[in-house]
Regions:
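Conserved short loop/turn motifs at secondary-structure junctions
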Residues: 215-219, 365, 446
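Phosphate/pyrophosphate-binding active-site segments
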Residues: 2-3, 139, 202, 298-394, ...
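N-terminal alpha/beta PP-like core and its mobile active-site loop of ThDP/TPP-dependent enzymes
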Residues: 2-343, 383-386, 459, 466-469, ...
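Active-site diphosphate/adenylate-binding microenvironment
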Residues: 9-22, 30, 35-40, 352-427
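Short acidic/His/Gly/Ser-rich catalytic and metal-binding motifs that mark active-site loops
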Residues: 35, 171-174, 247-250, 355-357, ...
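Generic enzyme active-site microenvironment
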Residues: 161, 303, 391, 444-445
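Active-site nucleophile and cofactor-binding loops and adjacent substrate-binding regions
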Residues: 27-29, 48-59, 74-81, 136-137, ...
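Thiamine diphosphate
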Residues: 102, 110-117, 268, 312-314, ...
Length: 565
């Protein structure tokens, strides 16, 4: 019996369905038109979200992936359509987000001729993706898609790019589903060395002042429960990286807060006082380590990670434990002895009190003056019972949101960590509403970041995406202005912002909105936002020259934090 003959575009549709895809984000164009034509017959199974710019498609796919744990998919045309996704691909690579970008390409016979909208997408994206492949034949579609999804989701997740030549979209081919669960040259889950585990166990059992650094690898490996079991048995306090904040509930007695330049005082100071440092699924980013020459020199360092290239890359490691966090944490928990570190844990308290008295109380509970950003974040977090998904943009809004929003559920934070991409928030929040339609999605952004991808309000309007947008408007590029104030003698070079009327913009898109200008209106505005079905834009006019504190100045040791500026 002969196999069914279908086009390469139809093979793509069936392959996506075979991978379990139900939602994709994209924008049509000439070189991808046959694929969109095939998609027309699959709209009952594949929900395509039409964005307003291809960068938005990539970020929406990221938001979808981060909250759902599934692979995000975007579909774009060649040339500028493909290059518009580059920022999102790079962002997904450094933040280990599984997305598959499918881009149209000129026909194979035109490759290398500088044809209309031809770009060497494979060449451009190889350094910023896990795998980049050009499909030139229709018969390769099913195999390429299966391989792409396997690579994107396995091991340390990341972006994959498929460059789909137009002739391969229209040519006919035999089709049958393909499954890929092994690639000879690719080891996504390396075997854990039992000797390394034994060495780690010995160090943990002997430790008097241990500290765990919790990274996003815990979330990516679905190891939240294993982490909690481990730290509770070992009685070890934790500091969380920006992307690892929701891996352990914020109110857990062992969660001592955020690490990094604008993190909490306790875990940053204690990094340079602990005797055993256990890094779990984190990469010792420069914003976490500060000055490397003085970073945790007194400690024995244990590093748990699935990616061997991260171990020893930035910080010398005494005991490397290779493997996925779920398995390695389970192994350690089984083998360690129950511990009590009451005195060590109590030593965090003075730093918590100092930070509250000198920073948090003033930022979150001011008695007078303009509204503070931290005050807004705390109020929204409380109003959502700390159960919402937090999506942030980049800058002061990001740091304030991540400092003062509280988490009770895993996979609850979506932000641009390593790349620091302004404009990330709005499209990523749209993606998050499709990835977890059962949860409230709160998108915190500044006036600078919103205007970078503001056209995606059109997507919000069309899809009736129930994203709750909290625009903290200070009429500045706030983070750059803060650095100009602290390190450049208050020379505010091109950081003041002239803004449009956001209420009129929201109205033009048919999005409910409210502007809050006084503290007395804040809680009412938040309640109106949360009680409104569908999207809502809450503009809060915040203090113009507010600063994010504490702060480790660039080039300083991680335990040196400014409490005022």
């Amino acid at each position: 019996m002969s196999k069914e003959k279908i086009s390469g575009s139809e093979a793509l549709m069936r392959s996506l369905e075979h991978e379990g895809v139900k939602t994709l984000f994209g924008y049509p164009g000439g070189a991808i038109m046959p694929v969109f034509d095939a998609l027309y017959d699959h709209c009952d199974r594949l929900n395509h979200i039409l964005v307003r710019h291809e960068q938005g498609a990539a970020h929406a796919a990221q938001g979808f992936a981060r909250v759902s744990g599934e692979v995000g998919v975007c579909l774009v045309t060649s040339g500028p359509g493909a290059t518009n996704t580059i920022t999102g691909i790079a962002d997904a690579m450094i933040d280990s987000t599984p997305i598959v970008v499918i881009a149209g390409q000129v026909g194979a016979g035109l490759l290398g001729t500088d044809a209309f909208q031809e770009v060497d997408l494979v060449g451009v994206t190889q350094p910023i993706s896990k795998w980049s492949y050009q499909i030139r034949r229709a018969e390769d579609v099913a195999w390429a898609v299966a391989r792409a999804f396997y690579i994107a989701r396995s091991g340390r997740p990341g972006p994959v790019v498929l460059d789909f030549a137009k002739n391969a979209q229209v040519d006919m081919t035999d089709y049958e589903p393909v499954n890929v669960d092994f690639i000879r040259s690719y080891d996504p889950d390396p075997e854990t060395d039992s000797t390394a585990v034994a060495e780690a166990v010995a160090l943990i059992n002997a430790a008097k002042r241990p500290l765990v650094l919790v990274g996003q690898g815990v979330e990516l490996g679905n190891a939240q429960k294993e982490l909690q079991n481990f730290v509770e048995k070992a009685d070890i306090p934790c500091g969380c990286t920006l992307l690892g904040l929701s891996a352990l509930p914020s109110n857990h007695r062992l969660n001592k807060g955020m690490l990094g330049m604008h993190g909490n005082l306790g875990p940053n100071v204690k990094t340079n006082e602990c005797d055993v440092l256990i890094a779990v699924g984190m990469r010792f980013d420069d914003r976490v380590t500060g000055k490397l020459e003085t970073y945790a020199k007194q400690a024995k360092i244990i590093h748990l990670d699935v990616d061997p290239s991260e171990i020893g890359k930035n910080v010398a490691v005494d005991v490397p434990v290779l493997g996925n966090c779920k398995r390695t944490l389970s192994l350690l928990t089984e083998l360690i002895q129950p511990q009590k570190h009451e005195e060590w844990i109590a030593s965090f308290k003075p730093y918590e009190e100092k930070e509250f008295n000198q920073v948090i109380e003033k930022e979150v509970f001011p008695k007078e003056g303009p509204i503070n950003m931290g005050e807004v974040v705390n109020a929204v977090s409380e109003a959502t019972h700390n159960e919402a998904i937090l999506v942030t943009d980049v800058g002061q809004n990001q740091m304030m949101a991540c400092r003062y929003f509280k988490f009770t559920k895993p996979r609850s934070i979506v932000t641009s960590g390593g790349m620091g991409t302004m404009g990330f928030c709005l499209p990523a929040a749209i993606g998050a509403t499709f990835g977890r339609p059962d949860r409230t999605v709160c998108a915190f952004m500044g006036d600078g970041g919103l205007q970078m991808t503001m056209q995606e309000l059109g997507t919000v309007m069309e899809q009736k995406s129930p994203v709750k947008i909290i625009l903290m408007n200070n009429n500045y590029l706030g983070n750059v202005r803060q650095w100009q104030a602290m390190f450049f003698n208050r020379r505010y070079s091109f950081t003041p912002m002239m803004n449009p009327d956001y209420m009129q913009i929201a109205s033009a898109y048919g999005i409910a909105s409210r502007r809050v200008m006084s503290r007395e209106e804040l809680n009412d505005g938040i309640q109106e936002m949360l009680s409104t079905d569908g999207p809502f834009l809450l503009e809060v006019c915040v203090v113009e020259e507010g600063n994010v504190l504490p702060m480790t100045p660039p080039g300083s040791s991680v335990n040196y934090m400014l409490m005022e500026c």
